[in-house]
Amino acid sequence: MSKRTIVDANTFFGFYPRRKVDSSLEALLQIMKENGVSKALTLSLKGVFYSYEEGNEETLRVCKNHRNLMPVATLDPRRFLGGRSEIESLLELGFKAFRLFPDVQGYPLNYSPVIEIFNCLDGLKAPLLISVGGRGDITAVSKLTCGKDFPVIIVGCFYSNLSEFIVSARKNKNLYVETHHLASPDSLEVLVNKVGADRIIFGSGTPLEYFQASYMMV
């Protein structure tokens, strides 16, 4: 039997200011090694809590030294003025995907700079991971990205808003869901039955979250 290839779409490294946790690069690499994770999309937490430009520089530097890490560029709409050229430059540097954190950085989804980022990504086919919070967020993301030509991966979907994702995903064929908060086996079964296994992206949130909690559900 061939060994399962594990790719984790949701990992981090760097200092996390909200609670005491070992979120160092070394911790991430050790968790990947212990659990047989072949590749991981990752980003520096500096880009989330401090400067997204400095965070992206650190992400790229680290990923160049570790071939099992794939760089994700953080974008902060509160400071984003570079337009499509900035996003194209990040892709040329080697970034594989983009990430928005409205839940952490405190901006609404129906926000002109966010809409500008969605428009800039259209046609580039690079995935966008976006964290959601309360009810209605998935609906808003789906409406704002429907018809655009890039994959949108919803991060932070719970069982309680699974129906919102399913209804939205039926209308928006570029919508996918990441798994780290889907903590019950039935949620994955429901997703497979309603939208198909190809719309489910494995992510753990490690090292901020416990890897096995996500992995055992898949």
Residue ranges and their predicted role:
Residues 18-21, 52, 83, 110, ...:
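Alpha-helix N-cap/helix-start motif
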Residues 1-57:
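An N-terminally biased module of ancient metal coordination in phosphate/nucleic-acid-related enzymes
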Residues 97, 110-202, 209:
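Catalytic pocket-lining loop regions of alpha/beta-barrel enzymes
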Residues 39, 47-129, 171:
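Active-site gating/metal-coordination segments in enzymes
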Residues 4, 35, 67, 93, ...:
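Structured loop/turn residues at beta-strand edges in well-structured enzyme cores
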Residues 10-16, 45-47, 74-78, 101-105, ...:
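Active-site beta-loop-alpha junctions enriched in small/polar residues
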Residues 24-31, 55-62, 86-90, 113-117, ...:
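A general structural detector for well-ordered alpha-helical segments in enzyme core domains, enriched
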Residues 10, 32, 59, 63, ...:
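Conserved, mostly hydrophobic/aromatic
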